[in-house]
Structure formats: structure tokens, C-alpha cells
């Protein structure tokens, strides 16, 4: 599985395009905010002759959903996420006003993912891990074959997700990381919602919130 990373919007959010040799792809957490950012995303997809088959949110905070409507309209995709994130998604028009940023309302979640579900595209299978704490129903996507993890805002290089937003809970987040993510192999590469990639092994050894 190949992963293309785009850092978008005023929150420096990481948007991911996951694809394989079949050219099918999924777009995870599209944060594209400006026309230039939208063009960066669509140009990459066109240049690589990719076919988007899923639009997925790990969670529905504003920085991760700013491009949902654009991607949904452009590629005819419905939204896939955990059912528990709909309440978060519903709050984002108000959140966008609080931050003073424009927001085209995302479509509602139509396809629901839960713990141990398998999301497929092309020849690739992703296992869904339920990882709440940063948000009430955040999910992570794990590819066992390629040892890659899309973690949203659950785990970062040297840090963890904030828990002071509505629906956040520190104990729940730590429990999610320890029971879901730290069970994975040390070599698993972690792609977070912000910042650089890391590995499970590095975070197990040196993350100050986990040691």
C-alpha cells in the first residue's frame, strides 16, 4: 500500500491518499481548505490515474472535514466513519464560526465502521481499530500486510491527541492507545493527523505520555 501525504489548512492537518497497484484509492480526512489545496489533491489523483472509492474520516473535527464536501461532490463518494462521530460532525458549522473560517457543510456519515470491521479497496484490506479519547468515536486504520497505521489524532510523534475538546477524555485516550495501538508490532509505521510519521516501537519506548 502506498500513502501520499498532504498537509492542508490553517491547522496543518495531514490528509492521506491510500492506493495500491490496482489504482483504486481512498481519501482519508480531507482537510483541503483553499482552491490551491483542492487542486493539489485532485492533480495528484489525476496524475497517478487513481480512482477514489472511499471517503473516510478517522474523526470529524473541523480540520479533518474541511474538504469533505469537495471530495464527495468531485468523486461522487458518500462519507464513511464511525456512527459515534456524527454528533461531532453536526457541531462543525458552529466550530467553524468560532475559528472564523469558512466551511462547506460535510455530508452526513452514510457508511459506518466499527471495531474489527474490514475496509477494502483494490487488493488492500484495512482493519478498523476503535480508538476514542481525542474524540468520542475516533477510528484508526491498520494494514497488517504493509505494517502501516492511519492513526488520526490519537497518537503523534512524541505526543498524543488533545483531550480538552468536547467528547475528549484523557483516560479513554490512553486506554485506546495501550489496548489497541501498542499491541501492534514495533515496526508498524504510524501516520498521524498532524506532524511527521513515527513507529509504534519509538512511541512505546520514548513517548512521555506512555512510558
Spans of features found by a protein language model:
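Residue-level detector of beta-strand structural context in well-folded domains
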Residues: 16, 111, 116-117, 139, ...
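Short Gly/Pro-enriched turn/cap motifs at secondary-structure boundaries
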Residues: 6-7, 108-110, 130-132
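Metallo-beta-lactamase
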Residues: 32-33, 50, 95, 124-211
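Active-site HxH/HxHxD metal-binding segment of metal-dependent hydrolases
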Residues: 33-120, 205-209
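Short catalytic-loop micro-motif centered on adjacent basic/acidic residues
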Residues: 27-29, 54-57, 128-130
